[in-house]
Amino acid sequence: MEKQGCEIEALDIDYNIFVRKINVNPFGIFRRKPRPEADQPVKTEEESLKLEDETGNKVKHVLKGVTCRAKPWEILAIVGPSGAGKSSLLEILAARLIPQTGSVYVNKRPVDRANFKKISGYVTQKDTLFPLLTVEETLLFSAKLRLKLPADELRSRVKSLVHELGLEAVATARVGDDSVRGISGGERRRVSIGVEVIHDPKVLILDEPTSGLDSTSALLIIDMLKHMAETRGRTIILTIHQPGFRIVKQFNSVLLLANGSTLKQGSVDQLGVYLRSNGLHPPLHENIVEFAIESIESITKQQRLQESRRAAHVLTPQTTLQEKRSEDSQGESKSGKFTLQQLFQQTRVADVGTMNIATEFTRDFANSRLEETMILTHRFSKNIFRTKELFACRTVQMLGSGIVLGLIFHNLKDDLKGARERVGLFAFILTFLLTSTIEALPIFLQEREILMKETSSGSYRVSSYAVANGLVYLPFLLILAILFSTPVYWLVGLNPSFMAFLHFSLLIWLILYTANSVVVCFSALVPNFIVGNSVISGVMGSFFLFSGYFISNHEIPGYWIFMHYISLFKYPFEGFLINEFSKSNKCLEYGFGKCLVTEEDLLKEERYGEESRWRNVVIMLCFVLLYRFISYVILRCRCSQRSFKTTLA
């Protein structure tokens, strides 16, 4: 018998969200207003109004006492109109959200959220994938991160999954997205499903898997899910908005939601019986699920009428008996066909004999931190070298700008005017290099979405991502530093010492790495590219203002002096000056037959000395580590707060 899934049961689920009427600071991810804990639910309207007075927020009841059950070998479809609470219920079943009241059980035991993420797959409505990786590479990297298997077995599993997903024809094609040409939308959705089933989960949960697809592609997706349920015994739960007639036939069970409440769960035929019991008669060849969704208003009115009659004791004993018989008849058809189907499903479950056995899976990650870092570094490197806008354009930009600057400042004279021009050159180089990496911000924002999705599934640690992200750019930035330093240094005629050239190249490398770290830090913080671009530009401008180039640090007001010491421009700027003018007896200005100003005098005037050469390098490295650490902390906060949902009005 094939591997079996798990029985998922939700009992009396209540879930509330807060609607804020005020503008929310997009950077306030560390500050959250008080919210009710799981053991302190908001149960009544009176309590809701009280909570609104205390916090300034309104409480919206998304789910109200929802109960449902999903079984192995079956597909449970959660249907209902927009705003019915389908996605919220799905995230609760996927252990991504915590309800205020109610419980979720896995194989009749309370769900262990950390463990459940290891044995389940959750496919979001949006395809969050790297567009420049091929289909096979995407699945292979996912397998490496989630499975501890030899390389041959990993490749064999990926090939088998590609065949199961029907993606052999596009296995070597790039995934693509809105801006990168790649595979079709239906194929991309199948890749998203493949990423979540590569570790062979017992439960597969999908949010609107047919959204945005044509009818043929949507049917292919559902047929594939049906095949997974019937051949591998998986428990499959999905939400769907407007299922077609052929799609509905594939569902074993349908959960009808309306206004956050359960109207009915059962087979499609049981749903038809339920509709008729409420006075609705769907046409013979009508799509029953669509008819039920369209008739929700009539159903709720009928239910409210029945509840009011019960409350007023209007029902006669005969009517009560008839309603009870009608409810009992929903569990079976007139011919007994569905009872036989249920017995057949129960027999298959009993054959496996694991329904009442606790699911035991390790909480640990599949790989060590070192292995995760190596895998992620490999994946990052593929993306960098395939991103022409980042790799080729940056390469041409750095080499071209180095040559142009070298020609503009060609062979500067060794006099006071030449010294001033050198200082201006260093200031421009700093401004250019520290502000030219903002174009990488969209790439980091895309990576952040993928990081949050993958870490929420337990694929790897956030710390491994932070280390890999820091390592992968080192060789790339070193190449850029050499391409820029070589022409500008020798064409301008800076310090002819080869060691001075190496130190200059080191400073350029650290400047590029510092700028990269700043962009990484703010990409973890800001909500989008527009805000990120504005914030980074403002921060860099402020740092340049207090660098010491426009105004000496001795003349900066005391209440602003802290900006001078945290400026990213200060230490490399000092490093350039020390590297160029230190240990040099060149005379810059003569008067009355003797030297009036030497290069050493310029350094003494600004109180720069040779002892600061390596101190500045160390401080620049500390800035790199600081911004990388801040980005790691922010990402950890984002990933840990992913389980909470707040609606902004």
From Swiss-Prot:
Keyword Cell membrane assigned to the entry: answer is no
Q: Where in the cell is it found?
A: Membrane
Q: Name one GO cellular component term.
A: membrane
State where ATP binds: G80, P81, S82, G83, A84, G85, K86, S87
Select a single GO molecular function from the record's annotations and give it: ATP binding
Q: Name one Pfam family in it.
A: ABC2_membrane
Which keywords belong to this entry? ATP-binding, Membrane, Nucleotide-binding, Transmembrane, Transmembrane helix, Transport
Transmembrane ranges, per UniProt, are: 390-410, 425-445, 474-494, 506-526, 529-549, 617-637
Q: How does it sit in the membrane?
A: Multi-pass membrane protein
Q: Where is this region: Disordered?
A: 308-336
Where does the record place the ABC transmembrane type-2 domain?
371-581
Task: Provide the ABC transporter domain boundaries.
Answer: 42-284
Q: Which family, according to UniProt?
A: Belongs to the ABC transporter superfamily. ABCG family. Eye pigment precursor importer (TC 3.A.1.204) subfamily.
Protein's name in the database = ABC transporter G family member 5
Which taxonomic lineage is given here?
Answer: Eukaryota, Viridiplantae, Streptophyta, Embryophyta, Tracheophyta
